């Protein structure tokens, strides 16, 4: 913008200078006569303001409007002209000079018009792009697939947002009319801080022309490639399928807008995006950082599962809980994930957990329900095995639906089992929730039947009981009885290795007491406890936290015989 203004000012100054030069050109031709023959006297005395030259018996002078040849008074002075006949205009040579200068002016004016048109076109493209990526209420397509393969989620973030700057090659700016709409393709730029707009050519080169050897995952609505960016960083490039519909551009732009607003250590960041026509098809891609260990489900099923100690599993659960807590309570706007599962929890080489795949996310209103919808969802979106009962039956999603899904993830961390898998007799499929709920009611069965065999019994029984209890609370049928993600984080913080000295603050006898007494004391640790915690300290939800969950007002309750079912 600054360069365009400077160019316009320079052109204006040149035109003013030319006008001044043109104003100084001789515009009178005088034919003068003299009585003397000494040309040197005439030139020095009478033609100082004009350009005079002898022509046979007369003189031809080219004079400006404010200076004419000197004429002798009464015609008696032989040292000056006796008479002159002046007329407006120029000689043939001066006319040629005037025409050449006029041509220069026309050329400069033509260039100025071209620059103005280019500036106007760039402004139209800028307005088009600004309207396209302006703040909108995020919406989700009803026909979008629930998820993509777990290996498609290999996304990583090793640095902060301020370090996520990438060198992008420039491309030719232009606007194209296609499908009766103005689609602008401009020079790659940054939006929302460190979110970059990549060119399709650059991402094509990064993935070796989207080679099948670069594919790291498939899904119903996308394919994910591993790519090498120009700065040497490895990225996960999610290439979206081209759905049919008039709202495709809106859905994509709102998804980019939503992802660009999220900045938290436990949420996978977006590096950039690409949206442009390539041939007859619109290409839409999202670029994330690469996660070296893949998804939680991949680790539990693969060789890395042998290395997942109990302490690592607690840390993973706490990190994922903090990511969801940020989405529910600190993001602007607050976000409902709607597809919480182990394949959407990614791990880096240090076992740090991050939440990903917000393709089905919804913004939340002040009451915790998804905004823009006052009626149940017409079609279920998500993954079987993680659906909350109220969502599967009535189609009503809320923060507590995410809490239920997170409870299933906790069961996966405890047992190592998949949410839905074939039983040993190979008859049908068995739900992890249905299998685990009866065992969660008995502290003895929790220790003997729930733990993953890969743990080889290497875990603290008290921590296992707390984790199992938390999973059971998240899986309660009544959404209002489930803990919030803030409360989940507080409970997990009591057993994380970094707060081992605070484990005794949680009353272990509370876990398996009778339902009536549990309801009475639930206020003490859940609603009231978190409330007092908010009054005592201010919590920064934008960064990882290691606060403790203290229960000074809750007295331990002795285990009663009726507690076991």
Curated annotation (Swiss-Prot):
Cytoplasmic-side positions: 125-565
Residues linked to a glycan: 27, 37, 45, 77, 85
Active-site feature positions: 339
Keyword Cytoplasm: no
Stretches assigned to the Extracellular side: 24-103
Enzyme class: transferase
Disulfide bridge positions per record: none
EC number assigned by the record: 2.7.11.1
Catalytically driven reaction(s): L-seryl-[protein] + ATP = O-phospho-L-seryl-[protein] + ADP + H(+); L-threonyl-[protein] + ATP = O-phospho-L-threonyl-[protein] + ADP + H(+)
The keyword 4Fe-4S belongs to this UniProt entry's keyword annotation: no
CDD domains from the UniProt entry: STKc_IRAK
GO biological process per UniProt: xylem development
Segments traversing the membrane: 104-124
Tissues in which the protein is found: Mostly expressed in leaf primordia, root and shoot apical meristems, lateral root primordia, and stele of older roots and hypocotyls. In leaves and cotyledons, highest levels observed in trichomes, vasculatures, and hydathode endothem.
PROSITE patterns: PROTEIN_KINASE_ATP, PROTEIN_KINASE_DOM, PROTEIN_KINASE_ST
Gene Ontology MF term list: ATP binding; GTPase binding; protein serine kinase activity; protein serine/threonine kinase activity
Region forming the signal peptide: 1-23
Subunit-level organization: Interacts with ARAC5.
UniProt protein name: Receptor-like serine/threonine-protein kinase NCRK
Native source organism of the sequence: Arabidopsis thaliana (Mouse-ear cress)
